[in-house]
A protein has these predicted regions:
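Rossmann-like NAD(P)-binding element
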Residues: 52-114
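C-terminal substrate-binding/catalytic lobe of Rossmann-fold NAD(P)-dependent dehydrogenases
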Residues: 134-140, 149-313
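Conserved N-terminal Rossmann-fold NAD(P) cofactor-binding segment
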Residues: 32-72, 301-310
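N-terminal Rossmann-fold NAD(P) dinucleotide-binding loop
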Residues: 13-14
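Glycine-rich Rossmann-fold phosphate-binding loop(s) that bind the pyrophosphate
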Residues: 9-10
């Protein structure tokens, strides 16, 4: 019997749990939150859609009862405050570091073999914090960001091409931030045809720019962080792990020399399966892409330094 847990029953966490249930990714999905009644209410609401939508997954909600999460295969951490308009992901670090560290430690008491998927922002830094504070092997700590950024990239590509997003392949690597992500336009394709042969350089650059500010654009429109795509991206990562699909998905993972970088978690393509990260895929980058990746890594390192400043590491 497979089991997934989502910690944090806010917009992103509840969306992730809902997608996991609807797609029957696990036999049981547990939602845990600190706010009394919220996860229980949302779980009940979801279960009342089971007959309408035709899924058999059981969704359970609980308030701060980590015993309910016992023996989870995969745990998604969405806990923390959401990003407010004008706030950078990095400004969240002081608050969210303490929350994420506490959650991860409590989860492992009851699910010592669980694979952790981190969504909390700043995502690369929270993934790094989890890895360093827990001492788990690096294949078991995964940051979701690249899956979301790549989905946004494919959306903007499909809009420019006038096609379905499922007909487009595209990948975003680097940090999960407005200035640190690197949409790899050179490798994007539509039905196997390089997008660079179908769109002008100017249009392609517009797509890249829109992708990079995709999260901030939604925050301005919504007044808070987006939740449908982030929650779905988290569920997408969980599905590849629990179902051992061996999908290649860009995720924030710990590097030890890959792409010329070490001692940080940053977005690169990986193969996801039952062991979490089955393999880090090293792409052959151009000189320009290598330079952008090095700058992105430097920015992530700088944000990670704040963990020591706030006493989280």
């Amino acid at each position: 019997m497979s089991k997934g847990t989502v910690v944090g029953a806010g917009n992103v966490g509840a969306t992730c749990a809902n997608v996991l249930a609807f797609n029957e990714v696990a036999d049981e999905v547990v939602m845990l939150d600190v706010k009394e009644g919220v996860s229980e209410g949302k779980a009940m609401d979801m279960m009342q859609t089971a007959q309408l939508l035709g899924f058999d997954t059981t969704v359970v909600g609980c308030t701060n009862d980590y015993a309910q999460t016992a023996n989870s295969d995969v745990v998604v951490i969405t806990s923390g405050i959401p990003r407010k308009p004008g706030m950078t992901r990095e400004e969240l670090i002081g608050v969210n570091a303490g929350i994420v560290k506490s959650v991860a430690q409590n989860i492992l008491k009851y699910s010592p073999n669980a694979i952790l998927v981190v969504i909390s922002n700043p995502m690369d830094t929270m993934t790094y914090l989890s890895l360093k504070s827990l001492g788990l092997p690096k294949n078991r700590i995964i940051g979701m960001g690249g899956a979301l950024d790549s989905s946004r990239f494919k959306y903007f590509l499909s809009q420019a091409l006038g096609c379905n997003a499922n007909e487009v392949e595209g990948m975003v690597i680097g940090g999960h931030g407005d200035t640190t992500m690197i949409p790899l336009a050179r490798l994007a394709t539509y039905k196997g045809i390089p997008v660079s042969k179908l769109l002008s350089a100017e249009k392609l650059q517009e797509v890249v720019a829109s992708t990079m500010v995709g999260g901030a654009t939604l925050t301005k429109l919504l007044g808070t962080s987006a939740w449908y795509a982030p929650g779905a991206a988290g569920a997408y990562v969980v599905e590849s792990i629990i179902h051992n699909q061996k999908k290649m998905v860009p995720c924030s993972v710990y590097l030890e020399g890959e792409y010329g970088e070490s001692d940080l978690c940053i977005g690169v393509p990986v193969i996801l399966g039952k062991n979490g990260i089955e393999k880090i895929v090293e792409l052959e980058l151009t000189a320009e892409e290598k330079e952008l990746f090095a700058k992105s890594a430097a920015a992530v390192h700088k944000t990670n330094e704040a963990l020591k400043e706030v006493g989280a590491l």
